[in-house]
């Protein structure tokens, strides 16, 4: 199964421990299919979604539409995880480009990537 970045899938995330999202819920595939195809294990990197609004860049809003979502949903960037592809129960559709950008911005913030978190080093002057 080859899933593009931004694909919305229905996954069974149980079992989990602690505060991890559990149960059957929509999730966004954020791993690159070209990289995943060459890996030893059949894993996807995903971001779970919820219907409960969150504040800030780690919880971008995702509207109903071509993604297959039927109501306003919110990505839970801080619940990023890898799952086996066998957990996929259904494929819905793709996020709109602006929604995937918002997810990518949240991932960059959460993982410490990007210009706003990693300024260019100042050249050393002797």
Predicted regions mapped to residue ranges:
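Conserved functional hotspots at enzyme active or ligand-binding sites that engage polyanionic ligands
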Residues: 1-126
């Amino acid at each position: 199964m080859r899933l593009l970045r931004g694909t919305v899938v229905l996954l069974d995330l149980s079992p989990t421990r602690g505060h991890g999202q559990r149960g059957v819920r929509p999730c966004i595939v954020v791993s690159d299919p070209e990289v995943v195809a060459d890996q030893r294990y059949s894993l996807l990197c995903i971001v779970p979604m919820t219907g409960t609004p969150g504040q800030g860049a780690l919880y971008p809003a995702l509207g109903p539409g071509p993604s297959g979502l039927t109501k306003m949903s919110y990505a839970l960037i801080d619940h990023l995880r890898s799952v086996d592809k066998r957990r996929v129960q259904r494929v819905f559709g793709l996020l709109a480009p602006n929604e995937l950008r918002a997810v990518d911005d949240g991932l960059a913030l959460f993982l410490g990537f990007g210009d706003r978190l990693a300024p260019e080093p100042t050249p050393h002057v002797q």
